[in-house]
Amino acid sequence: MQQYIIYLYTFLTIFGFWLALQISKRWKSMIFNTFVLTVLILAAILVIGKIPYDDYMAGNAPINNLLGLSIVALALPLYEQLRQIARQWKIILSTVVIASFLAMLSGGLLALLLGSTPEMVATVLPKSITMPIAMEVSRHLGGIPAVTAVGVVVAGLQGSIFGYLVLKKLGVKHQEAIGLSVGSVSHALGTVSCMETNPTAGSYSSISLVLCGIISSILAPFVFKLIYFFV
């Protein structure tokens, strides 16, 4: 019986995503973000049905096991744009390095100005890095990885919902620039949003996601020390 329940929860997740996708396609607005809608739909079902979250997560084992493959799938549009990206590697690398540095510095300084402890500054610092790397960076700096995970999700949601809209309003028209910008600050969630909007933006967001994770993990200790250098 338990085996059947596992598959039922898996199908429930797929149904929630399908329903969110239909709503997103129907209104065609970045506000109706597929990820956010899926979370809201599933949360409502769990609350109304009084389904324990632990049971739901255990029942999603088949989908959870596919998370690694979904990350690998992000490499497909990157491969399709590989030649163009190779010609612009200097611009891409410099943009990603600057974006990584400023994303960590701004978050850390804001936390410091708000009176946060060094532990909380270390927790907030890697908010714009993809989840696994961000949690490890936070732990290494003396932060709280679990709280960092929340910050990563919030940063991802903000970028995936508003990133594309804000850049368009600012007059940024090049999909390459949009992809690099969104991927640098909103990691996987922002990249998925770019994928849904424009393949080129999705490709550049993918490479920004990967490079920012690597570069930020190297720069994080130096940025953390820099924040407290003048304090």
UniProtKB/Swiss-Prot annotation:
Annotated transmembrane regions: 4-24, 29-49, 58-78, 95-115, 147-167, 211-231
Subcellular location: Cell membrane
Protein's membrane topology: Multi-pass membrane protein
Keywords: Cell membrane, Membrane, Transmembrane, Transmembrane helix
GO CC annotation, single: plasma membrane
Family of this protein: Belongs to the YohK (E.coli)/YwbG (IPA-22R) (B.subtilis) family.
UniProt name for this protein: Uncharacterized protein HI_1298
Species, as recorded: Haemophilus influenzae (strain ATCC 51907 / DSM 11121 / KW20 / Rd)
